[in-house]
Swiss-Prot record:
It is an enzyme of class 2 (transferase). InterPro entries: Glucans_biosynth_gluTrFase_H, Glyco_trans_2-like, Glycosyltr_2/OpgH_subfam, Nucleotide-diphossugar_trans. One of its GO terms (cellular component) is plasma membrane. Residues 1-28 are annotated as: Disordered. Pfam families: Glyco_trans_2_3. Belongs to the glycosyltransferase 2 family. OpgH subfamily. CDD domains: Glucan_BSP_MdoH. This is Glucans biosynthesis glucosyltransferase H. It is a multi-pass membrane protein. It is found in: Cell inner membrane. Involved in the biosynthesis of osmoregulated periplasmic glucans (OPGs). It comes from Xanthomonas campestris pv. campestris (strain B100). GO terms for molecular function: hexosyltransferase activity. The gene is opgH. HAMAP family: MdoH_OpgH.
Length: 645
């Protein structure tokens, strides 16, 4: 695997080279790699301490866990001072248990965000000799860029790939790269369109013999199976593979630096970038990409700081050592029926864990810019994707106990599982918090006695309940505050986000909109958890990439029941006590207005109006990199062509 293999151009009129392929593939000679299925019942951790692990990684993790436990212990002690006087009921015990778990959850995020903030402000955390400001290194090995696709618009898809191809060519090192479109498309008319657009792309850029296309006849194991099929057939020609998503765009500069990082660090198995979300047009997409651009680095630098050489894999915009992947990332089929059994859905976490078990270092480089993706245009589209992620993360319950995994790899999976269980836990915490004063007050609903949860909690603890609420909200919102402070300290980023005042207004509006959507997300994530536990499979559909166009009937079908439930609960609370209704208002209002909120945030004109006002601006809009400009030009031109699908 010295990267010296030369690929000869493949004619475009060849029949399928394998019974594994459908349609008319155009492929290089095969160079198979064995990719054995890994056992979850056997195995051992090959290397405990990686050479590339940062100094003091043990102290970093001690800070994270120790800080989380200390903050949680203090909060629990104060909560006990609220609950203990006058006895300790079953409901209060439930409240305390939920509070411990949820406060520990947000305390860990807070501790990680603080570390990320310090790293960002200090401009530290650079790894593996990858310096974005240094001259572009020269490469010595071959790398394959893989773009899996599933029932996507081929013109839109290959416009992004063409922009990447041209950007790599501008580095002067195109000879070190080949590009593969790996289709799992099941709709025949889309498959034929893919072949046509692929041929047009090769003619346009002179990519024959360097850009290849393959569609699987059987798309078993979804994306993981798609990539594994390529590794088993062609991986021997390429020491590295860079995995893209259908909406991924990366600069040639960033790609070259990633490859050089792999060449210079032979014990590194994977390098994950931090993709910036771009090209949002709707209000929802723009608030998401603004939040990711301002708060995202704080969170990403924080986790990279304590992950060290045991980082995670997000499934795309990452470079992987092909041999290491083949040797250790062959996924087994999980025992049992769907949704917990069968093929591994959230394969990226598991592949990273197995590669780390095999002795390879896994790193994240959040400081390396030039990596981009797109977000869902509407809350509805986000929640559809989130339902699939929910099933994939809960499925990790069957993997987390696998033999030989590094404890940080297990922690990644537990965090993924916990993310979805926090939604029903927040709902239960709210209900129990209301139920305790209701039970203690002995309410007679027929008389409609005056009742105030706020007064109950405040009076029972000399204000400690209010103190807990304030501290909880501070810990919850701290990443936003830290992201804003970091933005203020970076003049270029601050100007690119509209300036200090507009950025502050953007954060305020994003926080309000997120609060209004939170009850909807909490309800649907909770429903997703219960559906998975009840055995309901999420399926696999193509994602919506362009602006959402949600009809009112669709909105009513999706959120009408939640709105009616919110009205019912609000009315019932008001009949008990207006103060109780006021206490529940933050949740009830979000439920009641879910239809108009989702409708307004799904509009392109709303998002663009705020952009003109300088709200939710990101640096990639003020000074877009050439690769994004080119991708947008190509996609606009493609949109003018006669439709193929």
């Amino acid at each position: 695997m010295d990267g010296t293999v030369t690929l000869s151009p493949a004619p475009t009129d060849l029949p399928p080279v394998s019974s594994l392929d459908a349609g008319q593939p155009t492929l290089p000679p095969e160079a198979p790699l064995a990719m054995p299925e890994q056992s979850l019942r056997e195995g051992s951790l090959q290397v405990r301490h990686q050479r590339t692990s940062p100094m003091g990684i043990g102290l970093r993790r001690f800070y994270l866990i120790g800080g989380t436990l200390t903050a949680t212990a203090v909060a629990v002690w104060v909560m006990l001072s609220v609950l203990w006087p006058g006895g300790f009921s079953v409901l209060e015990g439930c409240l305390l248990g939920l509070f411990v778990l949820l406060f520990a959850w947000i305390a860990m995020s807070f501790a990680s965000a603080v570390a990320g903030f310090i790293t960002v402000v200090a401009r530290a955390g650079r790894k593996l000799g990858i310096d974005p400001d240094a001259p572009l290194p020269s490469l010595h090995t071959r790398t394959a860029l893989l773009m899996p696709t599933y029932n996507e618009d081929p013109r839109r898809l290959l416009a992004g790939l063409q922009a990447i191809y041209e950007s790599v060519a501008e580095t002067g090192q195109l000879e070190h790269f080949d590009f593969f479109v790996l289709s799992d498309t099941t709709r025949e008319h889309i498959g034929r369109a893919e072949e046509q657009v692929y041929a047009e792309l090769c003619d346009s850029v002179g990519g024959h013999g360097r850009i290849f296309y393959r569609r699987r006849a059987d798309n078993a194991a979804r994306k993981a199976g798609n990539v594994a099929d390529w590794v088993r057939r062609f991986g021997g020609n390429y020491p590295q593979m860079l995995i893209l998503d259908a909406d991924s765009v990366m600069t040639g500069d960033t790609i070259v630096r990633l490859v050089a990082g792999m060449e210079d660090n032979p014990d590194v198995g994977l390098i994950q970038t931090l993709p910036a979300v771009v090209n949002g047009q709707t209000l929802f997409a723009r608030m998401q990409q603004f939040g990711g651009r301002v708060y995202g680095p704080i969170i990403a630098f924080g986790v990279a700081w304590w992950h060290g050489a045991e980082s995670n894999y997000w499934g795309h915009n990452a470079i992987i050592r092909t041999q290491a992947f083949a040797d250790h990332a062959g996924l087994p089929s999980l025992r049992g029926r769907k949704p917990f059994g069968g093929h591994v859905l959230s394969h990226d976490f598991v592949e990273a864990a197995l590669m780390r078990r095999g002795g390879w270092a896994m790193h994240m480089v959040p400081y390396l810019q030039g990596s981009y993706e797109e977000g869902p245009p509407t809350l509805t589209d986000l929640l559809v994707r989130d339902r699939r992620w929910c099933q994939g993360n809960l499925q990790h319950a069957k993997v987390v106990g696998a033999k030989g995994l590094h404890w940080i790899s297990r922690m990644h999976m537990m965090i993924g599982i916990g993310h979805y269980f926090t939604a029903p836990m927040w709902g239960m915490l709210m209900l129990v918090g209301i139920g305790i004063p209701l039970a203690g007050a002995g309410i007679d609903l027929a008389q409609g006695l005056p009742f105030s949860p706020a007064r109950y909690w405040h009076g029972s603890s000399d204000g400690n309940a209010i103190w807990i609420f304030v501290c909880t909200m501070f810990v919850l919102l701290a990443p936003k505050l830290l992201g804003y402070i970091a933005l203020l300290l970076n003049p270029r980023e601050r100007r690119a986000c509209g300036g200090a005042i507009r950025a502050a207004l953007s954060i305020l509006l994003e926080t309000v909109l997120a609060a209004l959507m939170a009850p909807v997300v909490m309800y649907l994530q909770s429903r997703g958890v219960f559906e998975v536990l009840a055995g309901k499979d999420s399926g696999w559909d193509a994602q919506v990439r362009d602006d959402g166009k949600l009809s009112w009937p669709a909105l009513i079908r999706s959120y009408g029941g939640l709105s009616v439930f919110g009205l019912f609960m609000g009315t019932l609370a008001y009949l008990v006590s207006p103060s109780l209704a006021a206490w529940m208002a933050p949740v009830i209002v979000g439920m009641v207005v879910s239809i108009p909120v989702v409708a307004v945030t799904s509009l392109r004109r709303t998002g663009l109006a705020l952009r003109r006002a300088g709200i939710f601006c990101i640096p990639e809009e003020l000074d877009p990199p050439k690769v994004l400009v080119r991708a947008s030009e190509l996609r606009r031109a493609a949109a003018l062509e006669p439709p193929l699908i």
